[in-house]
Amino acid sequence: MASTLPTTWPHESVKFEDVSLRFTEEEWALLDRQQKCLYREIMMENLNNMISVEHHFSKANVMPQLEEVEDCWPMQREIPQDTLPECSGHSLDPEMNSFPAESPLMKIKVVEVLTLNKDMAGPRNALIQSLYPESGEDLNPGNLKPAQQPSKHLTDTEASRQKFRHFQYEESAGPQKSVSQLRKLCHQWLQPSTRSKKQILELLVLEQFLNALPEKLRVWVESQHPEDCKAVVALLENMTSVSKDDAWLACSSEATDELKEKRKDVATLPVTVPPEAPVTFQDVAVDFSQEEWQLLGPMQRTKYHDVMLETLGNLVSVGWEPTLGNRELTPDSPIPVVKPIHDPNPKDLSRNRTQSTLFESISPDEVQGRHTIESNPVGLLQEKGHPQQKLSESSKSQNQTCIDKSQCSLNEVLPRNHVKVKQKGTGKGKGRTNTISMTGGLRIRNQQKDSVEWRDRSGSTPVTHGSSIKNQQLGSEQGKTQTSRDPITLTVPAEFYQEATGSEEGRFRNSSNAMAADAPPKIHQKGPEWHKAGKSNNSMLQGSSAQNHQMGSRAGRARDNSILTHVKIHQKGYKEGKIQGNNNYLKHVKPHRKGSKEERLRELSTCQKHVPYVKQHLKTSGRGKGRKINASIKCGPYIKTYYRGSDVGRLRRANNCRKAISRHAQQISFIKIHKGSQVCQCSECGKMFRNARYFSVHKKIHTGERPYMCMSCGKAFVQSSSLTQHLRIHSGERPFECSECGRTFSDRSAASQHLRTHTGAKPYQCQHCGKAFRQSSHLTRHVRIHTGERPYVCTKCGKAFTQSSNLIGHQKTHRKKFKKQPKL
């Protein structure tokens, strides 16, 4: 505290009692430790002022005043006795201990005792430290520096501010005590007794300004301990060359080595001029080894594919000539295609949205031992005009891949359509190019010689296997081409194609059997298992539905009429011994010609030649609606007939046949409860349904019909939704995520059941006792306790159980008994 000495002095001597402040015992007990320390500092400042004006007073007059704050000096008893030899001993004589004016050093020693020693004084007693001599000079009143204001205790001030800002009201303390505590904390923070209003205002502005700074910047500024707003402004102005990462490292004592290395690399990165040589795709491409590629998951591979396509689009957009001629794909290099995580639904994609480009995954293990693609296998060029002509020209130049430059941009990525497989010919020197769709088509039919069409799911691009590719829209006539979107082809050796698809040379030839909707080319791995009908065109695999089989072009629908021809044999019957249908089926019809009408019908049921899922085919083709159709359809061990005007379908057993004779799919036997009502009842089990649509699914339980089959494991399902859910097991897709904990599920119902564990909802309540459950299966199991139902019966001892798990455990006891029996 700097001040000028007065020129005139009062005649009366100033005593220490005149400038000291005393507390009673009750008042002193109410003060906390910080307030007592503040009192000590003020007393020390008054003492220093008295010494600076050459006031003479004895130690006995000073010590009683400062003994009250003895608890603030825990180290006073450890001060060496030689610090003040004149004051050794407990009994101090006032006359012996008076401080003469000619001995300023004695005054300093007294001050030293009061401030716990020079080394212990620290920044809290900067005022006392200023009284010590510099360079060993003796002190005199002229050499003493004016008193300075004690330094601000930033640590204590910050702690007080934090306590004041985070003060919480306690009901047990009461409002009056809480207000007094808050006022005390505010005084400790702002210190109105020692600070002016301007300084207090500066503290408030400083606090608000620090809170307004970004988090990392605020932490760094607080680590510098600025005293006022000017210091903060100076720090921020000097930060023009300091990044936020540097600021974070400056305030963090545990910075990671990785971040330090990154900072070093960024700092030492030389500023170079971009090269004048053209940028190639290899400069921006990222390659993975076989081991690295196997460690990537499906999502990471999809991300890698998207990033590479985006990089390619950037290069094409700036006029780069996209060629990969000098890059050879070897068995050691990963195939830059990724496995599709899900098949994109075209209905969910708008015109302006980017369509997902998901490729069939080819692991590096499948590439082992296969031939290397030629040195210049893949090229990119812009196709204009006639696609067929351009494609034929491109096939002469190493089968280049065609991309429409207008379609290739950062906002839209071309979808995968098919893989072109080049196979070297052996006859006249001409090779054959096999093209396979990678999107999952709807069907394959014989379009021309050595050509099989696999239509894209979106209907935009059909894919042809053979010597030519023709773009046909779904439902359009044959020959009508489409140029809105050009295909993407990838050249692959024929040996790799044959091993990947499991098909031999000519497997696609003369094949008009329809394929499943979601089946990739791997459907041919099953071999003859999927062609049980041999060369017959009467069998059709059920993919999404037989309706997709009828959505093709008119020419394909006209050609593939063998199924209808077979149905006509049974549908129209025999008219006076004349056979209605194709002459190729004379041998098939002759066994049914003899006998009466009932006998012919009975023999007709023994027909072993069948057409799976004919009723779905007829439903989509529009034929047979509203009339009776007795077709040999594989429906189970029963024969169902339905006559117009009858209320209940007649059910009778076929003794020698596993086939059934039934009406159209929409006219299967059921009982309507009320006329005009949608509520119906199954004629076999009596189960009620709110709508005939639900009954159409239920009836497959009795008939054993499972039209939706998994192409990976061969498991069949009644509903398409069940197949979709099952396919997620093979693909690993888990699209349903819990919003509470982030856990993912492959089934929507499983996600909803899991969510009930967070919400505590129990929607399934027992009508007998009122107990609620989270899952319907738990309720079904509980109801058996009330009803006494025991559906699970042991076949060996006849004991019944309410749960299947109990039955399984019981059956193990029989096995143990059988093992314990001694051998004879």
UniProtKB/Swiss-Prot annotation:
Tell me which UniProt keywords the record has, alphabetically. Apoptosis, Cytoplasm, DNA-binding, Isopeptide bond, Metal-binding, Nucleus, Repeat, Repressor, Transcription, Transcription regulation, Ubl conjugation, Zinc, Zinc-finger
Q: Residue ranges of the SCAN box domain? A: 161-243
Ranges of compositional bias, category Basic residues: 418-431
Question: Where do Basic and acidic residues bias regions lie?
Answer: 340-351, 447-458
Q: In which tissues is it expressed?
A: Ubiquitously expressed.
**Cellular compartment(s):** Cytoplasm; Nucleus
Chief localization: cytoplasm
Q: Locate the KRAB domain: which residues?
A: 14-85, 279-359
What residues does the Glycyl lysine isopeptide (Lys-Gly) (interchain with G-Cter in ubiquitin) crosslink join?
Answer: K15
- State the Gene Ontology terms under molecular function: neurotrophin p75 receptor binding; sequence-specific DNA binding; zinc ion binding
Q: Which segments carry the region annotation Disordered?
A: 137-159, 327-352, 383-402, 418-560
| GO biological process assignments | apoptotic process; regulation of cell cycle; regulation of DNA-templated transcription
Which residue stretches are annotated zinc finger (C2H2-type)?
Answer: 680-702, 708-730, 736-758, 764-786, 792-814
Q: Which GO terms describe its cellular component?
A: cytoplasm; nucleus
Q: What does this protein do?
A: Transcription regulator which may participate in NGFR/p75(NTR)-mediated apoptosis. Probably acts as a transcription repressor: specifically binds to the 3'-end of zinc-finger coding genes and recruiting chromatin-modifying proteins such as SETDB1 and TRIM28/KAP1, leading to transcription repression.
Q: What else is known?
A: Up-regulated in Nrif1 mutant mice in the 129/Sv background, possibly complementating for the absence of Nrif1 and explaining why Nrif1 mutant mice are viable in a 129/Sv background, whilke they are lethal in other backgrounds.
The similarity comment for this entry is: Belongs to the krueppel C2H2-type zinc-finger protein family.
What is the name of the protein in this document? Neurotrophin receptor-interacting factor 2
Q: Which gene encodes it?
A: Nrif2
